[in-house]
Amino acid sequence: MPQLPSRNPTIGIALIVTAMLVVPFMDAIAKLLSAQYPVLQLVWARFFFHFLVVTPLALWRHSPIGFVTKQPFLQVGRGLFLLAATVCFWAAIKYIPLADAIALLFFDAVIIVALSALVLRERVQTSRWVAAGVGLIGVLMIVRPGFEAFHWASLLALAAAVFFSAFFLSNRVLTGEVVPLVALSYQSVGGFLVMTAIMPFIWVTPTATDLALMLAIGLIGATGHLLLIRAFEHADASLLAPYLYAEIIMQVVLGYWLFNDLPGSWTWLGIALIIIVGIFLSIATKEASRSDNQPIPGAHL
Protein backbone atom coordinates (compact mmCIF):
# COMPACT_ATOMS: atom_id res chain seq x y z
CA MET A 1 0.00 0.00 0.00
CA PRO A 2 1.63 3.28 -1.06
CA GLN A 3 2.07 5.91 1.60
CA LEU A 4 -0.68 8.52 1.67
CA PRO A 5 0.29 12.15 1.07
CA SER A 6 0.32 14.59 3.95
CA ARG A 7 -3.26 15.50 4.84
CA ASN A 8 -4.58 19.00 4.22
CA PRO A 9 -8.31 19.40 5.02
CA THR A 10 -8.57 22.62 3.02
CA ILE A 11 -7.37 20.83 -0.09
CA GLY A 12 -9.79 17.99 0.64
CA ILE A 13 -12.73 20.39 0.81
CA ALA A 14 -11.64 22.15 -2.39
CA LEU A 15 -11.35 18.82 -4.21
CA ILE A 16 -14.74 17.51 -3.14
CA VAL A 17 -16.52 20.79 -3.96
CA THR A 18 -14.86 20.74 -7.39
CA ALA A 19 -16.04 17.16 -7.93
CA MET A 20 -19.60 17.99 -6.88
CA LEU A 21 -19.71 21.01 -9.21
CA VAL A 22 -18.30 19.07 -12.18
CA VAL A 23 -20.12 15.73 -11.94
CA PRO A 24 -23.63 17.17 -12.53
CA PHE A 25 -22.50 18.08 -16.06
CA MET A 26 -22.26 14.33 -16.73
CA ASP A 27 -25.93 13.88 -15.83
CA ALA A 28 -26.95 17.00 -17.76
CA ILE A 29 -25.18 15.76 -20.90
CA ALA A 30 -26.87 12.37 -20.50
CA LYS A 31 -30.27 14.08 -20.22
CA LEU A 32 -29.58 16.16 -23.33
CA LEU A 33 -28.42 13.17 -25.39
CA SER A 34 -31.24 10.89 -24.21
CA ALA A 35 -33.56 12.68 -26.65
CA GLN A 36 -31.59 11.21 -29.59
CA TYR A 37 -29.87 8.10 -28.22
CA PRO A 38 -30.87 5.09 -26.10
CA VAL A 39 -30.10 5.54 -22.41
CA LEU A 40 -28.19 2.25 -22.45
CA GLN A 41 -25.84 3.61 -25.14
CA LEU A 42 -25.07 6.61 -22.94
CA VAL A 43 -24.43 4.30 -19.99
CA TRP A 44 -22.04 2.31 -22.19
CA ALA A 45 -20.14 5.52 -22.97
CA ARG A 46 -19.93 6.34 -19.27
CA PHE A 47 -18.30 2.98 -18.39
CA PHE A 48 -16.29 2.46 -21.58
CA PHE A 49 -14.46 5.78 -21.47
CA HIS A 50 -14.14 5.53 -17.68
CA PHE A 51 -12.41 2.16 -18.20
CA LEU A 52 -10.11 3.57 -20.88
CA VAL A 53 -9.00 6.45 -18.63
CA VAL A 54 -8.71 4.78 -15.22
CA THR A 55 -7.35 1.30 -15.97
CA PRO A 56 -4.12 2.39 -17.73
CA LEU A 57 -3.54 4.92 -14.94
CA ALA A 58 -4.04 2.24 -12.28
CA LEU A 59 -1.68 -0.15 -14.10
CA TRP A 60 0.95 2.57 -14.42
CA ARG A 61 0.79 3.54 -10.75
CA HIS A 62 0.38 0.11 -9.17
CA SER A 63 1.39 -2.49 -11.84
CA PRO A 64 -0.66 -5.66 -12.47
CA ILE A 65 0.32 -6.91 -9.01
CA GLY A 66 -1.81 -4.15 -7.52
CA PHE A 67 -4.89 -5.76 -9.11
CA VAL A 68 -4.49 -8.98 -7.12
CA THR A 69 -7.50 -9.42 -4.84
CA LYS A 70 -9.02 -12.26 -2.82
CA GLN A 71 -12.49 -11.39 -4.11
CA PRO A 72 -12.25 -10.51 -7.82
CA PHE A 73 -15.87 -11.45 -8.57
CA LEU A 74 -17.17 -9.29 -5.74
CA GLN A 75 -14.98 -6.42 -6.98
CA VAL A 76 -16.55 -6.67 -10.43
CA GLY A 77 -20.01 -7.32 -8.95
CA ARG A 78 -19.73 -4.08 -7.00
CA GLY A 79 -19.48 -2.31 -10.34
CA LEU A 80 -22.69 -4.00 -11.50
CA PHE A 81 -24.56 -2.27 -8.66
CA LEU A 82 -23.14 1.01 -9.97
CA LEU A 83 -24.22 0.03 -13.48
CA ALA A 84 -27.79 -0.67 -12.38
CA ALA A 85 -27.91 2.60 -10.44
CA THR A 86 -26.68 4.56 -13.46
CA VAL A 87 -29.21 2.93 -15.81
CA CYS A 88 -32.10 3.69 -13.45
CA PHE A 89 -30.98 7.25 -12.73
CA TRP A 90 -30.39 8.25 -16.35
CA ALA A 91 -33.68 6.66 -17.37
CA ALA A 92 -35.33 8.78 -14.66
CA ILE A 93 -33.76 12.10 -15.67
CA LYS A 94 -34.98 11.58 -19.22
CA TYR A 95 -38.45 12.34 -17.84
CA ILE A 96 -38.11 14.29 -14.57
CA PRO A 97 -36.04 17.36 -13.58
CA LEU A 98 -32.43 16.88 -12.55
CA ALA A 99 -32.99 18.42 -9.11
CA ASP A 100 -35.89 16.10 -8.29
CA ALA A 101 -33.95 13.02 -9.39
CA ILE A 102 -30.73 13.85 -7.53
CA ALA A 103 -32.64 14.66 -4.34
CA LEU A 104 -34.31 11.24 -4.49
CA LEU A 105 -30.91 9.67 -5.18
CA PHE A 106 -29.54 11.16 -1.96
CA PHE A 107 -32.17 9.11 -0.13
CA ASP A 108 -29.64 6.27 -0.36
CA ALA A 109 -28.16 7.50 2.92
CA VAL A 110 -31.46 6.50 4.54
CA ILE A 111 -31.70 3.19 2.68
CA ILE A 112 -28.21 2.29 3.90
CA VAL A 113 -29.46 2.56 7.48
CA ALA A 114 -32.02 -0.17 6.80
CA LEU A 115 -29.67 -2.36 4.75
CA SER A 116 -26.93 -2.07 7.38
CA ALA A 117 -29.31 -3.56 9.93
CA LEU A 118 -30.91 -6.17 7.66
CA VAL A 119 -27.93 -7.31 5.56
CA LEU A 120 -24.81 -6.53 7.60
CA ARG A 121 -26.55 -7.11 10.95
CA GLU A 122 -25.17 -3.86 12.30
CA ARG A 123 -26.74 -2.28 15.36
CA VAL A 124 -28.44 0.95 14.28
CA GLN A 125 -29.05 3.63 16.90
CA THR A 126 -32.59 4.90 17.46
CA SER A 127 -31.57 8.42 16.39
CA ARG A 128 -30.59 7.10 12.96
CA TRP A 129 -33.93 5.33 12.54
CA VAL A 130 -35.71 8.57 13.43
CA ALA A 131 -33.57 10.41 10.88
CA ALA A 132 -34.46 7.76 8.31
CA GLY A 133 -38.15 8.41 8.95
CA VAL A 134 -37.67 12.14 8.46
CA GLY A 135 -35.83 11.44 5.22
CA LEU A 136 -38.75 9.33 4.01
CA ILE A 137 -41.06 12.30 4.63
CA GLY A 138 -38.73 14.36 2.42
CA VAL A 139 -39.02 11.76 -0.34
CA LEU A 140 -42.82 11.80 -0.14
CA MET A 141 -42.77 15.60 -0.47
CA ILE A 142 -40.86 15.27 -3.74
CA VAL A 143 -42.63 12.24 -5.21
CA ARG A 144 -46.14 13.07 -3.92
CA PRO A 145 -47.73 9.69 -4.76
CA GLY A 146 -51.43 9.94 -5.54
CA PHE A 147 -51.14 13.61 -6.53
CA GLU A 148 -51.15 15.15 -10.00
CA ALA A 149 -47.46 16.04 -9.67
CA PHE A 150 -46.47 12.36 -9.33
CA HIS A 151 -44.39 10.93 -12.18
CA TRP A 152 -43.60 7.23 -12.48
CA ALA A 153 -39.96 8.03 -13.34
CA SER A 154 -39.50 9.12 -9.72
CA LEU A 155 -39.64 5.41 -8.87
CA LEU A 156 -36.65 4.85 -11.16
CA ALA A 157 -34.68 7.46 -9.22
CA LEU A 158 -35.58 5.66 -5.98
CA ALA A 159 -34.51 2.35 -7.55
CA ALA A 160 -31.20 4.01 -8.39
CA ALA A 161 -30.90 5.00 -4.72
CA VAL A 162 -31.38 1.34 -3.72
CA PHE A 163 -28.66 0.18 -6.10
CA PHE A 164 -26.31 2.94 -4.94
CA SER A 165 -26.93 1.79 -1.37
CA ALA A 166 -25.87 -1.73 -2.32
CA PHE A 167 -22.82 -0.26 -4.07
CA PHE A 168 -21.76 1.68 -0.96
CA LEU A 169 -22.30 -1.31 1.33
CA SER A 170 -20.17 -3.49 -0.96
CA ASN A 171 -17.49 -0.79 -0.73
CA ARG A 172 -17.61 -1.20 3.04
CA VAL A 173 -17.24 -4.99 2.77
CA LEU A 174 -14.29 -4.67 0.36
CA THR A 175 -12.46 -1.92 2.27
CA GLY A 176 -8.70 -2.46 2.13
CA GLU A 177 -8.79 -5.22 -0.51
CA VAL A 178 -7.06 -3.03 -3.10
CA VAL A 179 -5.96 0.59 -3.30
CA PRO A 180 -8.72 3.06 -4.27
CA LEU A 181 -7.50 3.66 -7.83
CA VAL A 182 -7.49 -0.08 -8.58
CA ALA A 183 -10.95 -0.42 -7.00
CA LEU A 184 -12.08 2.39 -9.30
CA SER A 185 -10.82 0.40 -12.28
CA TYR A 186 -12.54 -2.78 -11.11
CA GLN A 187 -15.88 -1.01 -10.74
CA SER A 188 -15.85 -0.04 -14.42
CA VAL A 189 -15.14 -3.55 -15.73
CA GLY A 190 -18.57 -5.09 -15.16
CA GLY A 191 -20.46 -2.16 -16.66
CA PHE A 192 -18.08 -1.95 -19.61
CA LEU A 193 -18.42 -5.66 -20.47
CA VAL A 194 -22.19 -5.90 -19.98
CA MET A 195 -22.99 -2.75 -21.94
CA THR A 196 -20.56 -3.61 -24.75
CA ALA A 197 -22.40 -6.93 -25.24
CA ILE A 198 -25.69 -5.04 -25.61
CA MET A 199 -24.44 -2.33 -27.98
CA PRO A 200 -24.81 -4.23 -31.31
CA PHE A 201 -28.57 -4.45 -30.71
CA ILE A 202 -29.28 -0.82 -29.82
CA TRP A 203 -26.43 1.21 -31.34
CA VAL A 204 -27.31 4.55 -32.91
CA THR A 205 -24.35 6.06 -34.77
CA PRO A 206 -23.58 9.40 -33.13
CA THR A 207 -22.51 12.58 -34.86
CA ALA A 208 -18.97 13.76 -34.22
CA THR A 209 -20.25 16.34 -31.72
CA ASP A 210 -22.39 13.82 -29.86
CA LEU A 211 -19.53 11.31 -29.78
CA ALA A 212 -17.39 14.00 -28.16
CA LEU A 213 -20.15 14.55 -25.59
CA MET A 214 -20.25 10.81 -24.89
CA LEU A 215 -16.51 10.88 -24.36
CA ALA A 216 -17.04 13.79 -21.98
CA ILE A 217 -19.50 11.67 -19.97
CA GLY A 218 -16.82 9.06 -19.31
CA LEU A 219 -14.10 11.62 -18.64
CA ILE A 220 -16.26 13.56 -16.18
CA GLY A 221 -17.20 10.37 -14.34
CA ALA A 222 -13.59 9.22 -14.07
CA THR A 223 -12.35 12.69 -13.09
CA GLY A 224 -15.03 13.01 -10.43
CA HIS A 225 -14.02 9.70 -8.89
CA LEU A 226 -10.35 10.62 -8.90
CA LEU A 227 -11.09 13.96 -7.24
CA LEU A 228 -13.10 12.14 -4.56
CA ILE A 229 -10.28 9.70 -3.89
CA ARG A 230 -7.85 12.57 -3.42
CA ALA A 231 -10.33 14.47 -1.25
CA PHE A 232 -10.74 11.53 1.15
CA GLU A 233 -6.96 11.20 1.35
CA HIS A 234 -6.76 14.76 2.68
CA ALA A 235 -9.76 14.95 5.04
CA ASP A 236 -12.08 12.79 7.13
CA ALA A 237 -15.47 11.73 5.78
CA SER A 238 -17.24 13.55 8.61
CA LEU A 239 -15.68 16.85 7.50
CA LEU A 240 -16.40 16.34 3.81
CA ALA A 241 -19.97 15.02 4.11
CA PRO A 242 -21.81 18.38 4.04
CA TYR A 243 -19.99 19.48 0.89
CA LEU A 244 -21.37 16.53 -1.07
CA TYR A 245 -24.69 18.35 -1.20
CA ALA A 246 -23.21 21.01 -3.46
CA GLU A 247 -24.18 18.50 -6.15
CA ILE A 248 -27.87 19.26 -5.60
CA ILE A 249 -27.25 22.99 -5.98
CA MET A 250 -25.40 22.46 -9.25
CA GLN A 251 -28.13 20.14 -10.54
CA VAL A 252 -30.71 22.88 -9.85
CA VAL A 253 -28.57 25.43 -11.72
CA LEU A 254 -28.07 23.15 -14.73
CA GLY A 255 -31.72 22.10 -14.75
CA TYR A 256 -32.82 25.73 -14.95
CA TRP A 257 -30.12 26.78 -17.42
CA LEU A 258 -30.49 23.90 -19.88
CA PHE A 259 -34.06 22.68 -19.38
CA ASN A 260 -35.89 25.61 -17.74
CA ASP A 261 -36.77 23.39 -14.76
CA LEU A 262 -37.12 24.84 -11.26
CA PRO A 263 -38.24 22.82 -8.21
CA GLY A 264 -41.61 23.73 -6.69
CA SER A 265 -42.10 24.65 -3.04
CA TRP A 266 -42.87 21.08 -1.92
CA THR A 267 -39.79 19.81 -3.74
CA TRP A 268 -37.62 22.44 -2.05
CA LEU A 269 -38.93 21.33 1.36
CA GLY A 270 -38.26 17.70 0.50
CA ILE A 271 -34.75 18.52 -0.69
CA ALA A 272 -34.04 20.43 2.53
CA LEU A 273 -35.17 17.49 4.69
CA ILE A 274 -33.12 14.98 2.70
CA ILE A 275 -30.01 17.19 2.91
CA ILE A 276 -30.34 17.61 6.69
CA VAL A 277 -30.91 13.90 7.23
CA GLY A 278 -28.17 12.95 4.77
CA ILE A 279 -25.57 15.12 6.48
CA PHE A 280 -26.50 13.67 9.87
CA LEU A 281 -26.33 10.07 8.63
CA SER A 282 -23.12 10.63 6.65
CA ILE A 283 -21.39 11.99 9.74
CA ALA A 284 -22.79 9.16 11.86
CA THR A 285 -21.52 6.65 9.29
CA LYS A 286 -17.98 7.80 10.02
CA GLU A 287 -18.23 6.42 13.55
CA ALA A 288 -18.97 2.92 12.29
CA SER A 289 -16.72 3.03 9.24
CA ARG A 290 -13.52 1.05 9.14
CA SER A 291 -11.75 3.66 7.03
CA ASP A 292 -12.19 7.39 6.60
CA ASN A 293 -10.72 7.15 3.12
CA GLN A 294 -13.69 5.27 1.71
CA PRO A 295 -16.47 7.08 -0.18
CA ILE A 296 -19.54 7.79 1.95
CA PRO A 297 -23.21 7.92 0.97
CA GLY A 298 -23.85 10.87 -1.28
CA ALA A 299 -20.93 10.56 -3.69
CA HIS A 300 -22.97 9.53 -6.74
CA LEU A 301 -20.72 9.01 -9.74
Question: How does the language model describe each region?
Answer:
Residues 21-25, 29, 57, 76-91, ...:
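Hydrophobic alpha-helical transmembrane segments of multi-pass membrane transport proteins
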Residues 1-18, 51-77, 126, 176, ...:
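Membrane-interface interhelical linkers
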Residues 37-52, 91-109, 150-163, 207-221, ...:
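Structural signature of hydrophobic alpha-helical transmembrane segments
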Residues 105, 121-141, 147, 151-154, ...:
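Loop-to-transmembrane alpha-helix entry segments
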Residues 102-107, 174-189, 225-257:
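Helix-helix packing/entry segments at the starts of transmembrane helices
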Residues 1-41, 149-173, 293-301:
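Glycine-/small-residue-enriched transmembrane alpha-helix faces in small-molecule transporters
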Residues 2, 249-301:
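C-terminal-most transmembrane helix of multi-pass membrane proteins
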Residues 41, 48, 91-121, 237-255:
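Specific alpha-helical transmembrane segments that line the substrate/conduction pathway
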